[in-house]
Design a protein with these regions (language model features):
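Glycine-rich phosphate-binding loops of nucleotide-dependent enzymes
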Residues: 1-223
Length: 223
């Protein structure tokens, strides 16, 4: 089954870019292809002038791309602080620098500091999602791929996660976002792409796409 059919995306440094579309449109496949979990038959993936097409996932991570998968996939029997440490395995910095990076994360997101000695599996769903994002940030990515970060979360945590995304972007991390809550995703994005059956059916400024009648009806629940 061919999930993607010649799609073309452009993400500029410092942007938040959203991909929206129905289930099965190819959104997750797109992220997994960029991060090296899936190898496409043809095409190119250019990141900072380098073609990543044949690169392994761990090398892509070292080059500055990190993915937060749908479903979080944290290490539930490890403490929060140990989950964060695992996110630093590709970094060659000193132990002191790694500790400093974790401390800076705790400063920006104090809720995680309060939970750092707690087993990850005992966190709420929203806290686990914050941890999953934090673990990805520990690899010091320039591009962060987020797959359905608000899926299954209570409304208060949805807002918290989106505030977290905005703060991460403010600190200079470029973000590619897949999100079921298209309204929220478009509200924080610079650009957006609409995927349908593995192809890009619409792209452009996120605010303009949010005003498109077809998109409003299909994805935003507005007749």
């Amino acid at each position: 089954i061919q999930a993607l059919k010649g799609i073309s995306l452009e993400i500029n440094e410092g942007e938040v870019v959203s991909i929206i579309g129905a289930n099965g449109a190819g959104k997750t496949t797109t992220l997994q292809t960029i991060s090296g979990l899936i190898t496409p038959k043809s095409g190119s993936i250019i990141f900072e002038g380098k073609n990543l097409l044949k690169e392994k996932a761990h090398n892509i991570c070292k080059l500055g791309i990190a993915q937060v998968p749908e479903g979080r996939r944290i290490f539930s029997k490890l403490a929060v602080k140990d989950n964060l440490k695992l996110g630093q395995f590709t970094i060659k910095d000193s132990a002191e620098k790694k500790e400093e990076d974790r401390a800076n994360f705790y400063k920006v997101f104090p809720r995680m500091s309060e939970r750092k000695n707690q087993l990850a599996g005992t966190l709420s769903g929203g806290e686990q999602q914050m941890l999953a994002v934090g673990r990805a940030l520990m690899s010091a990515p320039e591009l962060l791929l987020l797959d359905e970060p608000s899926l299954g979360l209570a409304p208060n945590f949805v807002m918290m996660i989106f505030d977290m995304i905005k703060e991460i972007n403010k600190q200079g991390v470029t973000i590619l976002l897949i999100e079921q809550n298209a309204n929220m995703a478009l509200s924080i994005s610079d650009k957006a792409y609409v995927l349908e059956n593995g192809t890009v059916s619409l792209s452009g400024n996120a605010k303009d796409i949010a005003k498109d009648d077809r998109i409003r009806k299909a994805y935003l629940g507005i007749a």
